């Protein structure tokens, strides 16, 4: 009897359609419930929910009740959700994004991320996303790396207990700013199963040496969350689609061919002044790009104000 050769895990099967979402950090001037309703009415299938002052603030009273209400609203609207943790001035009214995992007082950031994990678990989030932070000038690189690994290990343990998937985002200008940096951190943590990568498509064009579709292919096996926006080489500025340098149909094709089933969420945090218009324009663009990539496109949006009605 011939012994069959050992098998290796198969690549995830390709998908025929992608699920588009939108970041609530691009709806900063809307109440959260209003933002969710607008996005569902437009035809989005999910949201990247940034925990912020007016959007499910994890430090305000009645968190459990508010999380439960949002979970029910998401279900009623048919929206998937990922939790984002990049709010500005949430932890410190004087310093944007401080403290990070690299600061002397990193405990405040760790506490926030543990709260985000609990919120993500209660919402049934597909992922909780976070980043390293910018290294403070007085902190040596090796000390910053040690702090990052230690802080991430604590968050990984919390996520593992809660059954939550983490998406770590390389961010230009931060200690971990590219895919190579994510790979280093993943190895340093012992390659935990719950620690995936959040890939911002614009960042790939901004600073990666590979093409954007190749970046997608490089991380396909670890990809748990996707942010999408246009960008130009060497400039970290989130742009509306069609105003940067990215050719999107090959990017969407690479996501589908890699078997990615998570949300592909528009990331335009500086466009809240025209949020509904920009969100509508963005979805039209993505649907057109998906068709050009040979992918199926979701049903057209229902008339405004009717989503979730009895």
Short names for language-model regions:
Residues 2-21, 28-45, 71, 75, ...:
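Histidine-acidic metal/acid-base catalytic patches
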Residues 23-27, 52-54, 86-88, 133-135, ...:
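Active-site beta-loop-alpha junctions enriched in small/polar residues
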Residues 45, 51-146, 271:
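Structural motif corresponding to the early beta-alpha repeats
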Residues 151-157:
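Histidine/acidic residue-rich metal-binding segments in metalloenzymes
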Residues 176:
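Active-site-proximal segments of metal-dependent phosphoesterases and phosphodiesterases across multiple
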């Amino acid at each position: 009897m011939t012994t069959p050769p050992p098998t290796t895990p198969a690549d995830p099967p390709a998908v025929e359609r992608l699920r588009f979402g939108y970041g609530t950090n691009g709806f900063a001037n809307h109440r959260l419930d209003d933002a969710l309703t607008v996005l569902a009415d437009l035809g989005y299938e999910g949201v990247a929910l940034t925990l912020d002052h007016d959007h499910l603030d994890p430090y305000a009273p009645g968190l459990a009740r508010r999380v439960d209400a949002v979970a029910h609203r998401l279900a009623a609207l048919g929206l998937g959700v990922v939790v984002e943790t990049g709010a500005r001035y949430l932890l410190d009214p004087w310093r944007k994004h401080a403290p990070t995992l690299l600061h002397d007082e990193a405990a405040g950031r760790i506490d926030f991320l543990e709260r985000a994990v609990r919120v993500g678990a209660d919402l049934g989030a597909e992922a909780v996303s976070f980043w390293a932070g910018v290294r403070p000038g007085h902190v040596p690189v090796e000390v910053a790396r040690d702090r990052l690994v230690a802080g991430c290990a604590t968050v990984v343990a919390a996520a593992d207990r809660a059954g939550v998937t983490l998406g770590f985002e390389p961010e230009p200008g931060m200690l971990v700013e590219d895919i190579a940096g994510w790979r280093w951190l993943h190895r340093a943590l012992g390659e935990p199963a719950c620690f995936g990568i959040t890939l911002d498509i614009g960042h790939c064009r901004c600073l990666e040496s590979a093409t954007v579709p190749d970046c997608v292919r490089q991380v396909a096996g670890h990809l748990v969350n996707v942010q999408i926006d246009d960008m130009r080489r060497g400039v970290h500025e989130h742009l509306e689609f069609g105003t940067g340098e990215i050719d999107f149909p090959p990017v969407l094709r690479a996501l589908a061919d890699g078997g990615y089933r998570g949300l592909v969420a528009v990331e335009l945090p500086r466009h809240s002044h025209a949020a509904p218009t920009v969100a509508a324009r963005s979805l039209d663009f993505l649907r057109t790009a998906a068709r050009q990539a040979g992918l199926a496109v979701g049903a057209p949006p229902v008339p405004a104000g009717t989503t979730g009605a009895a």
